[in-house]
């Protein structure tokens, strides 16, 4: 019988020193504060500032998380793209409720969105698809996301085969590749604070406006 090692990481901690978030710092619309924080994350040269963890659930209620990149946003929604045969896309076809989380650790900040996802039309998707690097377009064809493969060489071989196939002309949009628009109705902003007295504010949509509450850390 193999032995199982136990790892105690309770002593791994640090203090949060960057300052707090006060009500006077808030904006009327949550997307305005999100845009400000995102710009600050970009200006601070954070790695992948548009990376977000998205959570979905399967038909049995089992949650799954993965990292994707935010590509567009406006005052009501956020957009990401994916393979429509992926696990996340299948989950959203069954239950379109979704959570998106931006962890900006160096800035001691987090932002969480709750909402519902809907598929973008091919017309909406194709413009973004053709703005991607050509090799990324080909990779979208090569990978049947979440399917089982015997070795990485299978994937690389398929990529090279498709690269030759699409050597001349435009790479067409795969029918199995698309995007999702997440319309959000709840946004929480978290800012680290001294002595674990973190600042949390939650925006919740009420008709055409937003109600804001401070939450205990």
Swiss-Prot record:
PROSITE patterns: PYRIDOX_OXIDASE. Pathway: Cofactor metabolism; pyridoxal 5'-phosphate salvage; pyridoxal 5'-phosphate from pyridoxamine 5'-phosphate: step 1/1; Cofactor metabolism; pyridoxal 5'-phosphate salvage; pyridoxal 5'-phosphate from pyridoxine 5'-phosphate: step 1/1. Binds 1 FMN per subunit. The keyword Oxidoreductase applies. The keyword Flavoprotein applies. Its EC number is 1.4.3.5. It catalyses: pyridoxamine 5'-phosphate + O2 + H2O = pyridoxal 5'-phosphate + H2O2 + NH4(+); pyridoxine 5'-phosphate + O2 = pyridoxal 5'-phosphate + H2O2. GO terms for biological process: pyridoxine biosynthetic process. Substrate binds at residues 13-16, 71, 128, 132, 136, 196-198. It is an enzyme of class 1 (oxidoreductase). Its cofactor is FMN. FMN binds at residues 66-71, 81-82, 87-88, 110, 145-146, 190, 200. GO terms for molecular function: FMN binding; pyridoxamine phosphate oxidase activity. It comes from the Bacteria. Belongs to the pyridoxamine 5'-phosphate oxidase family. Catalyzes the oxidation of either pyridoxine 5'-phosphate (PNP) or pyridoxamine 5'-phosphate (PMP) into pyridoxal 5'-phosphate (PLP). HAMAP family: PdxH (MF_01629). Homodimer. PANTHER family: PYRIDOXINE-5'-PHOSPHATE OXIDASE, PYRIDOXINE-5-PHOSPHATE OXIDASE. This is Pyridoxine/pyridoxamine 5'-phosphate oxidase. It comes from Photorhabdus laumondii subsp. laumondii (strain DSM 15139 / CIP 105565 / TT01).
């Amino acid at each position: 019988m193999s032995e199982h090692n136990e790892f105690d990481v309770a002593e791994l901690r640090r203090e949060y020193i960057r300052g707090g978030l006060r009500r006077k710092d808030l904006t009327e619309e949550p997307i305005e504060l999100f845009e400000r924080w995102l710009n600050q994350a970009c200006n601070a040269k954070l790695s992948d500032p548009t990376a977000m963890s998205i959570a979905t659930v399967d038909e049995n209620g089992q949650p799954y998380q993965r990292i994707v990149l935010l590509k567009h946003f406006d005052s009501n929604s956020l957009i990401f793209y994916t393979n429509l045969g992926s696990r996340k896309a299948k989950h959203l076809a069954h239950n379109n409720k979704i959570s998106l989380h931006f962890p900006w650790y160096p800035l001691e900040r987090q932002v969480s969105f709750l909402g519902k996802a809907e598929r973008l039309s091919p017309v909406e998707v194709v413009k973004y698809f053709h703005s991607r690097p050509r090799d990324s377009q080909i990779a979208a064809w090569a990978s049947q996301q979440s399917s089982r493969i015997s070795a990485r060489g299978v994937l690389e071989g398929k990529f090279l085969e498709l690269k030759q196939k699409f050597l001349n002309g435009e790479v067409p949009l795969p029918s199995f590749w698309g995007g999702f628009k997440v319309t959000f109705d709840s946004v929480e902003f978290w800012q680290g604070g001294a002595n674990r007295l973190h600042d949390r504010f939650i925006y919740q949509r009420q008709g055409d406006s937003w109600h804001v509450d401070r939450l205990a850390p």
